[in-house]
Amino acid sequence: MDAGQLETILRNTPVNRVEKVEVMYSAPPEYHVRGAAINMILKHSNDYSFQGEISANYKNQYFNDGGMNGNFRLSTPKMAFDVMYGANNVKKMEYIDLDSKHTLKGELHNIIQNEQLRSKYWKHDLRVAFEYNFNNKNNINIAYTGSYTPDQYNNSRTSGNYQTSNVDKYIDNQMRNITLQYHSGFGLDIGGDYTYYTSNNAQRLYADYQDGSQSSFSMVGGQKIDRYSIYADQKQSLSKGWNLGYGISYRFAKDLDFQTYDKVTGNIQTQNTYSNLREQTDRKAHV
């Protein structure tokens, strides 16, 4: 998961449920992660319990925005069920003032510009996890993580002595991930996950320049990613406190990306793009 999703989980996880957090600048091979990683280990409950939390936040900066987050956990000696959900209503606005002086062919050009940026959207984060303990050493767990930002609207308005322009952008993002893991009592770990990501956007631009010329275009684009990964790791204890670990992993990904322009007027260089990539990575064994 990315940094934003990890932050959401950390904000919705009670402190008393965290056993430890490992920060690794170079993750070992059995984590199947390239580069840095953060591993959060939660405590296992050995009794019957139910706990939950609800929190809310509010902010006013040009607009009223805020959100609500909640989580609950039901556990028994054999199983545990977790649900985390957060909904945030995001409204942003900022101003950028530009006063720039450029010299071109010995002539000084003074450019004054004011830009207003606005964003408005709802962001939803969901995580559902289930863990079942066959005994003290064997367990299986499955987790679903989702992040949704439907109907995001961004607007940029620019005015000044060089141009007056308006850009409207509409975005719809979705990410879903499901993970399955099995931990055995004899050191064998088997797991896999599937990630689905899609992003669709539509954009309209109109610009009116100081010299009387105009330009405009409409654009639609999108990206769709399907990624599958599986792994198997084995750990063995040796004499004198040594451990031996080895395993294998495989990952396959499909990435579809496109961008198409329409209703282009004025002196604007546009290029339609399309790509459909398939990639197999991390097919390797490690010791």
Q: Across the structure, where does each feature detected by a protein language model lie?
A:
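Transmembrane beta-strand segments of Gram-negative outer membrane beta-barrel proteins
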Residues: 43-62, 81-83, 188
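Short acidic/polar hinge/loop motifs at secondary-structure boundaries
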Residues: 2-26
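Outer-membrane beta-barrel proteins
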Residues: 55-69, 109-125, 163-175, 217-227, ...
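N-terminal periplasmic accessory domains that precede
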Residues: 7-9, 22-23, 33-55, 68
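Flexible, solvent-exposed coil segments and beta strand-coil junctions
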Residues: 45-53, 100-112, 154-165, 204-216, ...
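Extracytoplasmic beta-strand/coil segments of soluble accessory domains associated
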Residues: 1-2, 39
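Face-selective signature of the C-terminal outer-membrane beta-barrel domain
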Residues: 125-149, 168-287
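Transmembrane beta-barrel wall of Gram-negative outer-membrane proteins
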Residues: 63-91, 107-151, 174-185
